[in-house]
């Protein structure tokens, strides 16, 4: 973490689960300052009190900026002296974005453009934009706007001066805000049925710590315009629900199938067939370089493009599929789950 020594890091949408994970990982390092940029003063105040209580010796490294990525001036006001940015601000609830698609455009697309414009103007060294598997072959408003966010990042990277811009794309982050596992735990505690959409649906799963690791990998190894992807495992929704039931004493027969929600897919994709043509296998990660050809395609009428796919689409059906015991182990390793199990005496 030597590159963060005495540096200033700005996290947009910083009061969310990702921002909390970064603070837990970074605060006790020699980083200079972490700026939390978000629009909800209540969440900022809650975060301030939380970290003053649990890390009083380093909590003064956190600085809070109220603002909104939808406003370019708001973004500019938080950029002075910033070295690095983790851009996590987003509207990410699939059904909500289906009903309010223009709100998703304003935050996920225009907001990203504002953050990158302000960062380039301020001479920020590196910006990592957080994207999602729903941006690959998108069928819902959330995924479509995140796909455009990725396009905006690549376009901005072509004229970004000294600012390096990369994107990360990852799957479902377990126990992040608005995710399904905390809902299931509450349902079990209250003696209610555990509601799932479709048991055979598959989803990539990763922890918040793995999400932070992916961003750090992009920071260290990404080049301007790159997209970085982690090779995450997956499980079915039915397996995940059964794992949570077994951990918290729920009954398998209490699992209730309610049907697929607005805009959901049966499986998700992290690396598309089209991206495979240029993707570079980096062990536990894929790196997809930006397509920086100009708009002059005349030569391709004569020469063509010799690149051919050497990889195949990486999706939640063809990755490593975890069974119930493996899924239980992964879920049980999470700090949130350990705290919840302690509350119920397990």
Where do the model's predicted regions map?
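Hydrophobic/aromatic anchor residues within beta-strands of the central parallel beta-sheet
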Residues: 64, 104, 165-168
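Conserved residues in the N-terminal Rossmann fold of short-chain dehydrogenase/reductase
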Residues: 38, 65-66, 106, 198, ...
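Conserved Rossmann-fold cofactor-binding substructure of NAD(P)-dependent oxidoreductases
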Residues: 63-84
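Strand-loop microenvironment adjacent to phosphate/nucleotide-handling motifs in alpha/beta enzyme folds
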Residues: 3, 121, 151-172, 179-346
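Rossmann-fold scaffold of SDR-type NAD(P)-dependent oxidoreductases
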Residues: 12, 79-88, 129
């Amino acid at each position: 973490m030597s590159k963060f020594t005495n540096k200033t890091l700005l996290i947009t949408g910083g009061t969310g689960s990702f921002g909390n994970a970064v603070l837990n990982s970074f605060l006790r390092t020699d980083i200079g300052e972490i700026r939390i940029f978000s629009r909800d003063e209540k969440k900022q105040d809650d975060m301030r009190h939380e970290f003053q209580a649990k890390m009083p010796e380093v909590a003064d490294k956190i600085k809070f900026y109220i603002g909104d990525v939808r406003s370019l001036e708001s973004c500019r006001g938080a950029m002075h002296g910033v070295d690095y940015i983790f851009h996590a601000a987003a509207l990410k609830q699939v059904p909500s974005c289906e009903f309010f698609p223009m709100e998703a455009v304003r935050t996920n697309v225009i907001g990203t453009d504002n953050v990158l414009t302000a960062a380039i103007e301020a001479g920020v060294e590196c910006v990592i934009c957080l994207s999602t598997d729903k941006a690959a072959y998108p069928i819902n408003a959330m995924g479509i706007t995140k796909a455009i966010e990725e396009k905006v990042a690549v376009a901005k990277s072509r004229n970004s001066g000294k600012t390096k811009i990369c994107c990360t794309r990852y799957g479902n982050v377990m126990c992040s805000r608005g995710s399904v596992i905390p809902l299931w735990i509450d349902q079990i505690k209250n003696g209610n049925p555990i509601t799932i959409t479709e048991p055979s649906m598959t989803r990539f799963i990763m922890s918040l710590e793995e999400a932070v690791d992916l961003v750090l990998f992009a920071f260290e190894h990404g080049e301007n315009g790159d997209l970085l992807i982690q090779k995450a495992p997956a499980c079915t929704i039915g397996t995940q629900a059964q794992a949570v039931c077994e951990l918290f004493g729920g009954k398998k027969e209490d699992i209730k199938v309610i049907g697929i929600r607005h805009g959901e897919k049966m499986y998700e994709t992290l690396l598309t067939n089209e991206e495979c043509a240029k993707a570079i296998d980096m062990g536990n990660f894929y790196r997809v370089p930006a397509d920086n050809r100009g708009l002059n395609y005349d030569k391709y009428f004569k020469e063509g493009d010799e690149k051919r796919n050497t990889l195949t689409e990486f999706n939640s059906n063809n990755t490593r599929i975890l069974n119930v015991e493996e899924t239980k182990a992964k879920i049980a390793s999470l700090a949130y789950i350990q705290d919840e199990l302690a509350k119920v005496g397990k």
